[in-house]
Amino acid sequence: YHYGFCIDEDGVSEEWLNVKAKTRTTYRSIFYRNRADDELDLSGLPKDLQKNIHLSLNKGALIISLGSKLKIDICIQVYNWFARNKTVDFANLIGALQMYTSMPPGFAEDIQLQSNVVHFLSSFDKSIQGFKVEKVDTGERKGLKIWTKHKKIDSDSFQLLPLQEESAGTLKMIALYSFLQEVLDKGSVLFVDELNARLHSLLMRNILLMFLNPNLNPNHAQLIFTSHDTNHLTKNLLRRDEIWFTKKKNGKSELYSLAEFESDGGKKIRKDVNYEKNYLLGMYGAIPELTSINLFGENKYGKK
């Protein structure tokens, strides 16, 4: 499927859905709309439902959503693909703080789930041996009090540590657990903004390797993430078509793939070059325009 739409302050300005069989090289159009040209082509949809869509369509509605409500199979398939996907926004500080203090659904009662989380955390922190969970109900507020169990050195007993006192990286991994588990189980797509925030580079690489390992990811789940960590710009981890850059100019962001990038000589980027080094040298664009930092304007020596 090839689906997309454009929106502006007046609503949907363009929308299209094209489809092709895996054995074919060309797409056929299912529908297309273009407000600027006053064009609406629904010829690829069932004829008996085209009139219903035409009458129900407004500037704020998507054909794919209307088609799904009308039980049109091809629209349902595309709509459900988006519905199964998960989005995590760690760039939103308030939302991120809420995620850091939340646990997977059913965590308090499900001992097996708690064990699964411990096993997940053991990939980078073997000191956490379990959890202690208490339900809190003061009448005004309901919630959970959670401690992590750490085995004492040279002892069979445990030290309890309030969950909120764990490192930010541990809290983020706990927040990610249910999202990772669900998309890997369903074979859907996980979108994560600022995946690298609060995570060690090697830990983040471990997450990428999990998606790249067919034994751990048999359902072909996908991970799409933003990051400022350049350590992963390497051919040993990612293909050129898996690396995308965003270049900001005049309030707009342009998105382009390393596979599409051409040098000044018009040549494609070779697979054997050092992606990270070339990126930091500015060869691929998408880097900030920096000048020397001066916090105080004129300093005590009279220089700016």
Predicted regions and their residues:
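Extended helical coiled-coil dimerization/tether regions that scaffold
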Residues: 95-165, 275, 283-284, 288-289, ...
